[in-house]
Amino acid sequence: MDSAAPALSPALTALTDQSATADLAIQIPKCPDPERYFYTSQCPDINHLRSLSILNRWLETELVFVGDEEDVSKLSEGELSFYRFLFAFLSAADDLVTENLGGLSGLFEQKDILHYYVEQECIEVVHSRVYNIIQLVLFHNNDQARREYVAGTINHPAIRAKVDWLEARVRECASVPEKFILMILIEGIFFAASFAAIAYLRTNNLLRVTCQSNDLISRDEAVHTTASCYIYNNYLGGHAKPPPDRVYGLFRQAVEIEIGFIRSQAPTDSHILSPAALAAIENYVRFSADRLLGLIHMKPLFSAPPPDASFPLSLMSTDKHTNFFECRSTSYAGAVVNDL
């Protein structure tokens, strides 16, 4: 008995139908723009960010999490639950960003922007793989337990609040510039509290390599949000920008959701995340929003003060010297504009 032939995807079906009736040919425009066929720099600011990304490439294989596995047992039950939740969210959100990058890059012809997005997609893959490793560390390498937890957590109300808000804003999105505002909010606001809460592990000398990877990922995301701001400012000619009230409204809503996210999940039995630490994280989220508004040439919304020197993410801004025992240097080549 003959088995049924596997179904083809729509794209492959179209290709098969076309090849059955005519030879495939590359269509070259009659009057092509010569710059289409060679590289020329058109976006120096984006090209700088691409170069910075290349200088600071890193891989998940450079980090060794053995010591972190021992530290998991030092977390309280509430702390362990909290950090499992954060990394379940970050992993899912990071994959969502990766899926959307292809759609954004297709809007542009400038090769600097296209080349930059290639670099961003590559490092987002590394982030996804690192989050996979950290999740397994938090579940004592029990993959089945991790799978069951993620399946039961991904629709948690705190996560759904972010996803539902984003889906609603995308549906009502009236312009390409507004899509970039949403990307700025995803990477610049919806990750901010999680990055800060993870950094507080450092103050207790816990999960050192997880904190190290958090430094690297936080810096990468700072580059990504800066790129979105540059594109919003300089490369969306012909597209009407959303009115200021609309932009401020989106920022205000995103900040409220992010602060609600961290408040609803913060452990009550924690010596890592004290009430003062949570207040500092909330201020950091507001400060991040004001900084991003400044990058798109708008006045601050919250006038939040910058975090003080004791804030754990402040350590990202200090000069670092790689010591013999450090698995991977977290010193960034070049200047990185971050939230501090």
Curated annotation (Swiss-Prot):
Its EC number is 1.17.4.1. PROSITE patterns: RIBORED_SMALL. The keyword Membrane applies. It catalyses: a 2'-deoxyribonucleoside 5'-diphosphate + [thioredoxin]-disulfide + H2O = a ribonucleoside 5'-diphosphate + [thioredoxin]-dithiol. GO terms for molecular function: metal ion binding; ribonucleoside-diphosphate reductase activity, thioredoxin disulfide as acceptor. It is found in: Host membrane. Its cofactor is Fe cation. Changing D17G: In strain: 17 syn+. The chain crosses the membrane at residues 180-200. Keywords: DNA replication, Host membrane, Iron, Membrane, Metal-binding, Oxidoreductase, Transmembrane, Transmembrane helix, Viral latency, Viral reactivation from latency. Its main location: host cell. InterPro entries: Ferritin-like_SF (IPR009078), HSV_RIR2 (IPR034715), RNR-like (IPR012348), RNR_small (IPR033909), RNR_small_AS (IPR030475), RNR_small_fam (IPR000358). It is a single-pass membrane protein. One of its GO terms (cellular component) is host cell membrane. It is an enzyme of class 1 (oxidoreductase). The keyword Membrane applies. One of its GO terms (biological process) is DNA replication. Ribonucleoside-diphosphate reductase holoenzyme provides the precursors necessary for viral DNA synthesis. Allows virus growth in non-dividing cells, as well as reactivation from latency in infected hosts. Catalyzes the biosynthesis of deoxyribonucleotides from the corresponding ribonucleotides. Heterotetramer composed of a homodimer of the large subunit (R1) and a homodimer of the small subunit (R2). Larger multisubunit protein complex are also active, composed of (R1)n(R2)n. Belongs to the ribonucleoside diphosphate reductase small chain family. PANTHER family: RIBONUCLEOSIDE-DIPHOSPHATE REDUCTASE SMALL CHAIN (PTHR23409), RIBONUCLEOSIDE-DIPHOSPHATE REDUCTASE SUBUNIT M2 (PTHR23409:SF18). This is Ribonucleoside-diphosphate reductase small subunit. It comes from Human herpesvirus 1 (strain 17) (HHV-1). The gene is RIR2.
